[in-house]
Structure formats: structure tokens, C-alpha cells
Amino acid sequence: MLQKREKVLLLRTFHGRTLRIVREHYLRPSVPCNSPLCPQPATCHNDGKLLSSDVTHYMVPDWKVVQDYLEILEFPELKGIVFMQTACQAVQHQRGRRQYNKLRNLLKDARHDCVLFANEFQQSCYLPRERGESMEKWQSRSIYNAAAWYYHHCQDRMPIVMVTEDEEAIQQYGSETGGVFVISFKNYLDNFWPDLKAAHELCESILQSRRERENESQESHGKEYPEHVPLEVLEAGIKSGRYIQGTLNVNKHRAQIEAFVRLQGASSKDSDLVSDVLIHGMKARNRSIHGDVVVVELLPKSEWKGRTTALGENDGDDKALGESPSEPMPTGRVVGILQKNWRDYVVTFPSIEEVQSQGKNAQKILVTPWDYRIPKIRISTQQAEALQDFRVVVRIDSWESTSMYPNGHFVRVLGRIGDLEGEIATILVENSISVVPFSEAQMCEMPVNTPENPWKVSSQEEREREDLRKTHLVFSIDPSGCEDVDDTLSVRALDNGNLELGVHIADVTHFVAPHSYIDIEARTRATTYYLADRRYDMLPAILSADVCSLLGGVDRYAVSVMWELDKTSYEIKKVWYGRTIIRSAYKLFYEAAQDLLDGNFSVVKDIPEFKDLDEKSRQAKLEELVWAIRKLTDIARHIRAKRDSCGALELEGVEVRIQLDEKKNIHDLIPKQPLEVHETVAECMILANHWVAKKIWESFPHQALLRRHPPPHQEFFSELRECAKAKGFFIDTRSNKALADSLDNANDPNDPIVNKLLRSMATQAMSNALYFSTGSCAEEEFHHYGLALDKYTHFTSPIRRYSDIIVHRLLMAAISKDKKMEIQENLFSNKDLEELCRHINNRNRAAQHSQKQSTELFQCMYFKDKDPETEERCISDGVIYSIRTNGVLVFIPRFGIKGAAYLRNKDGLVVSCGPDGHSEWKPGSLQRFQNKITCTTTGGESVTFHLFDHVTVRISVQTSRCHSDTIRLEIISNKPHMTPDTELLQQCSLLLKSDLVKEVTRSVEEAQLAQEVAVNITEDYQKYCQTKGRSLYTLLEEIRDLALLDVSNSYGI
């Protein structure tokens, strides 16, 4: 029977007054204990994760240990941890949402042997707070009391070790209950885990950092930064309009000088500002770090500054030579931080000379983060000299107003500087990507498909699903070598003369149950991560490449959308959604499908499904397939024309096709020619996504997951308009239809690169497409700008995207009749769905950034060992696409590289070009105009560079110990680079990118084989490489764009 108590809460108002609030608190005779030793598991309702039975004791951390040592408690070696509800709530209230979510994810993770015990709802465990008792003492008393009850509940069969940092608690409770031990966390590690070196090192690092903070707080220092305004004052200031709230974005090219705050929430609606707010200098940033949610006070207009327009190299100089800022913009200073965005940071120790200059016994070391946007971090360690050649991970603990730099602690070593695996690990950590293997508990939920026990369709599913195996010609069209097929198509004539178009998607949700271990893991990952030489899957291969993959000639479960179309106009008459069983008849590659569409039937010999047929059967089946492909293409043309009339955009993307040998290693990388079948498949997928979006919104108007693409801000188009104007084109950006038509008309017949660059600029001006819950936005905000659709979602790739899994569940709930209530119980509320959408959006950005950074890594490694003075491949044609005050931005079509080329160096010399076009550095000056820049020497020689001029560029690599290497471009001639294969250049060929990946990978493999003694490379490889073996295909498939000109997903398709 429930017992009711009253819980008193003391809350502070905006005005600083304290309110006493009394809430009802109900106690239960039993709550889940999640122990295998439970004498009454049915009474305790132990339905979730249980603690391991293979442990010598249970460990109960108190609230302070959970707060300070959570990263050690995350070690999978530490088993049998019982987190008390009291400790978890202390983390939530005192450390904020980020730390609390980290703890929640730890409890959900099947790889970690830990559980939550709701001690404050258990009748025998709950202790009311005594009058005059401090919150800290009550929390320790409650946790100890719950630990003692837990010991007796398990029939005194498992010792309990409570770990705490409270010496008084150790003295008071240490010998109070037999079988329940109370010790410090350091003693716990010393006694129970003496060989867990990483935990001991991390513990010492955390203790050292804490001691440094305590010492600093006792010393009297002058203020380096102003104190932050109290929270209640910040909230009142935001509400009154005095302050502005937004996210801090640091300019990575001028990280010491420039940062911008983009308005969000109430600030963006109530403010008259139409641009970001400039935060100039570290003092004005006031200890905020890139990504923090900050509160800003605007400075008087007389103190506003302009955005820097010069090229920068993060050299820390406040004023570049001849720098001329843009027009003054709103400028402010940070007065408070609402939410810190601290995470793990990859850093590098200073060189041995710098360490020695600080003194032989110096323990405080300033380490330099890999990310330019993060300030140096001060840590305490005696390993600085030993680790100076390694990339390591640190965490920030505090940033006091008396300190120039934040304080942090050392966490772990990643790998050697410059080593491929170490650099890849750096990219993963910097984007908060976890790539641990799938756990045993997760794999136990997976279906089995082996020669001894093959997977097959169940009789129950045959009864409940629509069986299309004998009635529909279903086939897939995918890139060459693709093995994880998640979409197939069908089209057929109906008896009434109309047509039926079908899109059939892998039924992943049949195998991934809501709230299962694999579902929680997929939700955490949110997407499959594609790097330049590998991939990390969202789902195990047994699903992604086997039983969920819609391979040819095998039975598979699918979720289908089928439309009845008018036979001539292709207007949609009706639509059907449902679960189906399909057997794909053909697994076609794009090129083969295009050949069949064009009437080139010689490709038939390369289609496996035709090989064993006699001539008559082959001809009949060929005619059937060709009719289907041509009819699909005709339907897709009609769909596309309809979207075009509404303003659908076609923006620039560079795609490549991977050619494989028999062993599935890369044989070649060929520029992907635009084929009409690409458009055909894409239009069918867009149609399915659109109609599913409408269906789930109609059924769940307040909790459907859709994808919106907001219209871009008009000021973001200014550079696009000016560049187009330089070529005599007018770009109308008032609507998506006007923009699409303008881009179509902006063609230079003598230089196709111009239109590609203009479309690229249009892409960069776009807002990001975002997932959202329909209950959190007004319906007029649902629109997808890039696709010109009123409602859109992602339904067609559940193998790779968790958003699609949610959409499949919503669709099943919308069309279900028999189990409607049961299915709907597993759906997210609007609040929970919106939180999930924020997580997925965040993970999508991380996936895009990591792919781009890994591509840049490979580009640098490819050019790093080549002599730019003699190597022919280091000289290439480039196109100027932007003018700056001290140089230009150049695009190199052959490699897809974008970068800065300086026209004035650090010595103040400017580029001068002779009659033959070759350049040299001479004293002189620069004069920048809107669409051109002129270099004039003191001798009177001048050369002018215009927008879209072709120049000859030398490519080299700017190396860095602390940061990633970067591509360096130098204009060596103001004339185009002449190559024997001009057609290759016109196609923006990325042919040499195959050499880039193959050569870098091969050189790394050879180096590893040559080294008999590797420095923990094996350990790092096992930790960060999910895909085994040397097959580059299993790592590279699905990569659509190895170039930096990555715009294929920028506008949200």
C-alpha cells in the first residue's frame, strides 16, 4: 500500500525571494532492485537490466563521488554499481542537464553493469530531512541507509561497498552495519582495482585538479575577467530585453579575436537585430567557450566593430597588415553563461623546449587544443615530456575569474601525432562520436542467419502482411557494389488501366523493438558515420547487410507505400501503406539501369539474374524489366516537373562511384556522371517521404517527426548576388522558385565551373534542414524550402538513420487496427520527441563534420610527402570565387579543394606577375574592389585578379604539431594551368582521389607492417576501428562525396 509524505522544496524567484513549496511524495513497499539475488523478483518488478551475478561485491557511490568521478565510473571494468536515486538527483540539480544525461545514458547502456535504485520511493529506505540538517549530510545519510537496506534485501549474500569523499561519513558509518563497508574512492580503487592503471591515473588527475582549484580559491589574485551576473538577474534581463541569449560561435580562423552569438529562443523573436552579435576579444568573451549558451549585453553603437574581411591564420595578431573590417555590426560582451558546452578535448603538450623553459619541476602545463576555437587549458601532470609526441584527451573542470585559462585534468592518450589511427581517433573524440563494438546483450537480440540455421519468413508474418512476392516485379537500383539495400521499387499496370507505383523499404522496426538494448544503442548513435576511409554503423551488420537488406532473390520484410496513378496524367488516385513481404527480382546498378533505359541491351550479359535463362525467357523478362524502368522514369519526370513548378532547388554536388575488385578493395574512383536513373530513384524516395509525412502528421498532429528546411536569411545571399553580378547574371533570392530559375539561367557557356560555384554559394547560404516534433512548431513552419514541399520526413533509410526508425513506428501506429493502443504506448510524447530531434540533429552535424575533417586529413596526407616544387600533381588549375583584403579564396576542381591564397605575405610583400604569368614576391600594396583585387609593386608593376579567373596554383601542406595539418595554396601564375586533358578538368574530375585514399592507406599499412614495435597502435585500432580486415569497400561504401565541396545534404534532402 502506498504511503503519502510531504516533501518541502525551497525555490528562489527571479527577484531573489525564497518560496516554500510542499509537494506530495508517495512511498511504495517495493521498487525494482534489479539484483539477481532478489528473493522476490516478481514483487520488485525486476523487468529491466539486472546486475551481473559474477561480482564479488556491489559498489554504491555517494552523491559527491558520482559528481566528481563519473568518468571513472564509466569504465566497463567496474561492475556491480548501484546508483541511488538521491545521488542521481544531486547530479541533476548541481551539475546540470549535460552531466545528468551522461549518467542516464550510462544506466541505459547494456555494456555497463550498473543499475538505478529508486531509494526515495521505497518505504524502508526513505528518510525525511531533519531540522537543521544540511543537504549534503542528508544525502549521505540517505544513501548509506539505502545501501544497508539493499544488503539485507539481498539476504546478506553480497557485500556492499559505499564509496564517499566525506571523512565524517566514513568514521560514522564505517562499522555500523556488518557487510556494508564505507571507504574513500581512492581506497576503493587501491584495494579492489589495483591493476586498473587508467582509472588510477585519471583519479590522480582529478584529485590534482581539485587541489589546484582549492589552492587558487584561497589565494588572492587580481581579476582577469569580470564576474558573471547571477542567474536570476540574467533571466530577468532576458525577459526585459536588456540582455540577449544565444549560442557562442568562435571564428576558427581568428579564434583569439572574433566570436559571434546567434540569437535563439525569446531573444530572436523579441529583438530588432537582424544579424549575429560580434564578441570582439577574449575579455569580452568572459570565459565562455565555443558552443556555450551565453547571455550578452550590447555595447553602445559608438563601440560597435566590423567583421574581419582579411584572410587569417590564427597567429594571434589582432591587426593583420592592411586589414579593413566590414561595416560596424552589433557588438556586445558576455555577462553570463546559461549552459556550458564542455566536452572531451583533444590536446597536445608543448614541445620539450617549452616545458623546460617553465622550470624542471613545473607541474602546471598549458596544453593546446586541436580545435582552434578552444582556449589553452591548464592541467597538472608530471608526464608532459613523456607525452609531448602524443594526442591526449583532457576535460575542463573550472574557469575562475582570476585565471587567464580554464583548469582541467588529463583523461587518456589517443595516439602519436601524425599517425593515421591517432588522427582518426582525434576526429571521433572532437565530434563526440563513440565507436565501441556492439555489446553481447545487444547482439543477443539479433536474428540468426547461418547456413545451419537460415533466417526465413514466419507463418504468422505471412498471415499478417501483404504478400507481394508473386504479384509484383520488385527491383533495386543502387551504386555498384552496394550490399545494404534498404529501398526497392515496383510499377505495374492494374486491371482498371491505371498504374501502381510502389516504394518498398526495409522493415527494420520488426527487428528493433522499442526500448530494447539495440534500440537504445541506435538512438544514441542516431546515424551511421562515414569517414573518408571507413564507416561506423548504426546497426549491427546482421541487420544492415543481411536480414534487413533487400537483396535479390531472397524473401524480406518491408514497409511499403503504393500509389494508384492515372494511366496518362500520373495523378495520384489513392495511396496504401502497410507491411509487406517482398522478393526483389533484380539487384541493378545505376549504370546498368541507365543502359536498359537507353536501349543498350548489351549490358544484359552483366546482370546475374539473366545468366541462367533460355533465350525466350530472357527476352520476356527483359521486356518486362525495361518497361518498368521506362515507366518509372516517366513517372519521376512528371513528379519532378511538379516540384520544379513550386520552386524545388537543384544545388551543386560532386559525387563519385567506387569501383571494386573481386576482393572488394578499391580498384578505382570514377567521377559519377549524372544519370537520369539517379533522378528517378531520388524522386520516388522523395515522394514516399512526402506522403508518409502527411500520413503521420494527420494521425499524430502533435507528436510526428518531420523534417523542415527554413528559408535562408536574405543577407546570406549577398556574396552570391555580388559574384553573379561580376559575370553579368542576376540572382533573384526572393523565393525558392525565383532562386532556382536564376541559377538555371546563370550559365557561362565558356566556363561550366561558374555555375557550379554559384550553386555551391547558394548551398552555403542555406539554413540547415532539421528534424522536429510537430507539436513544437506552427504548421506554417513545416515547409521544406529546398524540396518545395509543405511536409517532409525521412522514411526511406532506417538502416542508416534513427529518425527513419521513429517514422516507421509512427506510420505503423497510424495504420494499425488490431494493436493500436499497444503500439501507441511506445511512441514519444511531443516533449520527448523534440528532445530526441535535438539529439539527432546534433549527431547529424557531427557526422557531417567528421566526414569533412577525415577527407581533409587524407588530402593532407596525400600531398604531405610530395615536393610541391617538383611534383606535377601539386600544380593545378584553380578558380577564384571570393575576394578578401589580403588575398583570394580558390577552388581547385580536380581535387575538390577550397582554400585561401594570400596575395600579401607576412613580410608585407605582394604577388607580382611577369609577362609570362609567373609570380614572385615584391614590395608593394593591395587595393581591393568589389569583384577584383589589384597588386601594385613599388616599381609600378600591377596585376589584377578578378572573380572566376582561372589561375595556376601550387598545393602544399602546412604542418602543425597541435592542430590538424592544412592545405596551403599559392598562386604561381595568373594564367590557367594547361593540362593535356582539358575534358577531365571541365568535368571537375576527382579521378586522383582514388590515388589519394589508396596511396595514403597503403603507405600507412606498409609502415605498420615494417614496424616490429608499435606504440599501442593495436590497442587504438581495436578501440576505434569497428570494421575488421583491410577491405576498404566495407569502410567506403555509402560515401557520396569525398571532396570538400560537400553540398549533397546541405539543403536537407
Swiss-Prot record:
One GO process term, biological-process aspect: mRNA catabolic process
Any one GO molecular-function label of the UniProt entry: 3'-5'-RNA exonuclease activity
Region spans: Disordered: 307-332
Catalysis performed (reactions): Exonucleolytic cleavage in the 3'- to 5'-direction to yield nucleoside 5'-phosphates
One GO cellular component term: cytoplasmic exosome (RNase complex)
CDD domains: PIN_Rrp44-like
Keywords linked to the UniProt accession: Cytoplasm, Exonuclease, Exosome, Hydrolase, Magnesium, Nuclease, Phosphoprotein, RNA-binding
Segments forming domain CSD2: 365-431
Cysteine disulfide links: none
Enzyme nomenclature, EC number: 3.1.13.1
Cofactors required: Mg(2+)
Keyword Lipoprotein recorded: no
In-chain residues carrying the UniProt-annotated modification Phosphoserine: S989
TM region(s), chain numbering: none
InterPro entries documented for this protein: Dis3_CSD2 (IPR041505), NA-bd_OB-fold (IPR012340), RNase_II/R (IPR001900), RNase_II/R_CS (IPR022966), RNR_Ribonuclease (IPR050180), Rrp44_CSD1 (IPR033771), RRP44_S1 (IPR033770)
Location within or outside the cell: Cytoplasm
RNB domain ranges (all copies): 465-816
Main location: cytoplasm
CSD1 domain span: 233-309
UniProt function note: Catalytic component of the RNA exosome complex which has 3'->5' exoribonuclease activity and participates in a multitude of cellular RNA processing and degradation events. In the cytoplasm, the RNA exosome complex is involved in general mRNA turnover and specifically degrades inherently unstable mRNAs containing AU-rich elements (AREs) within their 3' untranslated regions, and in RNA surveillance pathways, preventing translation of aberrant mRNAs. It seems to be involved in degradation of histone mRNA.
Family that this chain belongs to: Belongs to the RNR ribonuclease family.
Record's subunit section: Component of the RNA exosome complex. The catalytically inactive RNA exosome core (Exo-9) complex is believed to associate with catalytic subunits EXOSC10, and DIS3 or DIS3L in cytoplasmic- and nuclear-specific RNA exosome complex forms.
PANTHER family: DIS3-LIKE EXONUCLEASE 1 (PTHR23355:SF30), RIBONUCLEASE (PTHR23355)
Protein name, per record: DIS3-like exonuclease 1
Taxonomic lineage of the native organism: Eukaryota, Metazoa, Chordata, Craniata, Vertebrata
